Amino acid sequence: LVDVATSISRVALGTWERTELTLPEAASAHVVAASPLAGDEFWVAASSFTTPTTLLRGDASGALTEAKRAPAHFDTSGLETRQHWVTSADGTRLPYFITGDFSLGARPTLVGGYGGFEVSLTPAFSNVRGIAWLEQGNFYVQPNLRGGGEFGPEWHSQVVKTNRHKVWEDHKAVLEDVVARGYATPAQIAIRGGSNGGLLT
């Protein structure tokens, strides 16, 4: 992960020259198939907040070509994902993603969150979220709170036990930034979470 988005690089044998492969913007991706016995071909599955799971074919050149894509059951045109960084109460900087149609001004905004058990919240496509929320012209925010695994074990350990309150401070910093940037008013914001995220909200 590089700033919570997947980075995949090709390394040339012998020279060890590294070339980063071009993935969808703000994507989660992983290599799903590769075998030196089958040649230099490999396959990558990638998705983002606005792109459903896509199967990409790669080879030794480093180029990726789309082979197949899962259907999107809502209109993604006009939708964009941005990443912003905020500063929490103790000075720690953390990122969040916001997805929506930024031409519409302040809109109802749903903010998620988890911040626990070293679980990394990476970009992911959801038809349910798209149909029920994004297609209606609203914003969705995914914060990468401490307690998760986005930046390694220390990102998790910073907020355990007596420091647990810092997760709420992280979340508060994100909410304040959403308002400061004009994406939503306080009255337009709702927060949600499940499991550990339910304790957060």
Q: Which residues are covered by each model-predicted region?
A:
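Predominantly soluble domains enriched in secretory-pathway, periplasmic, or organellar proteins
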Residues: E25-A29
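Beta-strand-connecting loop/turn residues
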Residues: V4-T6, W16, D40
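A short beta-strand motif characteristic of beta-propeller blades
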Residues: E17-L23
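Short, solvent-exposed loop/turn segments at conserved positions within beta-propeller repeat blades
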Residues: L1-T6, S48-T51
